[in-house]
Amino acid sequence: MRIAVIGAGKWGSALHLALKENHNCFISSLHQRDLEDFVSIKEALECEYLVFALSSQGMRAWLKENFINKGQKILIASKGIEDQSCQFLDEIFLDFVPKENFCVLSGPSFAAEVMQKLPTALMISGINQELCKKFASFFPDFIKTYIDNDVRGAEICGAYKNVLAIASGISDGLKLGNNARAALISRGLIEMHRFGKFFGTKEETFLGLSGAGDLFLTATSVLSRNYRVGLKLAQNQKLDSILAELNEVAEGVKTAYAIEKLAKMKGIYTPIVNEVVAIFKGKSVQEATQNLLKQND
């Protein structure tokens, strides 16, 4: 049995380190990297099990360019919604593999802590529960895994919390205090759940690891790149310069636009996401924050 992680960024590297503890695991990306167990894309696609840790915005293009369906079993470890199409990652993968052949990984998990082998709990979601159990069995003891079948709920939580983390970073950057941040996160959880209900998700997904757990982690720590984007926006830095300086992908930026478009199409009330997008477009963080503080629901 051979596993390959596709994507050699921080998260992909952390997953590779964890999975190689007990299994024959490789790592690959489009560009040659000086990493242990690095293999070419062609070699990686020969593995029976694939873990995708690519940027959500680049996933479709990568699959079109490189993927050859050989019956591989797939774990989607990326978190985001494609901005251009407003499609979730499972919808993108359905163009390439049957739904029985993939699962989604979610939950509170900073790459740095996984690489330190600190205790972590993750959720694996899929309609093929046997495949979920199989992927769960690959992880080492310091990573506790749970399984369920709420794929869309897990994806919405994983994507939405990144936008809320930006909002939380803005709040902290403006030094509005712990009370304001707690209010923002709790109202954000309600907003995220309200959005998710339109897609037939389960309430418990939003209250568990995929939802509340990942949100609380990502929205309260400088280890979160999305939270750091919010901190810098609060200092009146321009988004383009923030992202250039970050030199990493902050999934919450593109995802915010996608959520806003989906919410408008379906008539879903998403005030926090709307204000974050407005800030991206030039609205002052002070005005946007005041608008949120005045919201009644």
Swiss-Prot record:
Compartmental location: Cytoplasm
Q: Which reaction does it catalyse?
A: sn-glycerol 3-phosphate + NAD(+) = dihydroxyacetone phosphate + NADH + H(+); sn-glycerol 3-phosphate + NADP(+) = dihydroxyacetone phosphate + NADPH + H(+)
One biological process term in Gene Ontology: glycerophospholipid metabolic process
Instruction: Look up the record and name the pathway of this protein.
Output: Membrane lipid metabolism; glycerophospholipid metabolism
Give the EC number(s) under which this enzyme is classified: 1.1.1.94
Q: Which Pfam families match?
A: NAD_Gly3P_dh_C, NAD_Gly3P_dh_N
Give the record's keywords alphabetically: Cytoplasm, Lipid biosynthesis, Lipid metabolism, NAD, NADP, Nucleotide-binding, Oxidoreductase, Phospholipid biosynthesis, Phospholipid metabolism
**GO cellular component, as recorded:** cytosol
Per UniProt, the enzyme's principal EC class comes to: oxidoreductase
List the active-site residues.
161 (proton acceptor)
GO MF: glycerol-3-phosphate dehydrogenase [NAD(P)+] activity; NAD binding
Main localisation: cytoplasm
Q: Which residues bind sn-glycerol 3-phosphate?
A: 79, 107, 109, 161, 214, 224-226
Q: State where NADPH binds.
A: 11, 33, 79, 111, 225, 249, 251
Which parts form a coiled-coil structure per UniProt?
none
What is known about what this protein does? Catalyzes the reduction of the glycolytic intermediate dihydroxyacetone phosphate (DHAP) to sn-glycerol 3-phosphate (G3P), the key precursor for phospholipid synthesis.
Give the family, as the similarity comment puts it: Belongs to the NAD-dependent glycerol-3-phosphate dehydrogenase family.
* Protein name as it appears in the record: Glycerol-3-phosphate dehydrogenase [NAD(P)+]
What is the species of this protein?
Campylobacter jejuni subsp. jejuni serotype O:2 (strain ATCC 700819 / NCTC 11168)
Recorded name of the encoding gene: gpsA
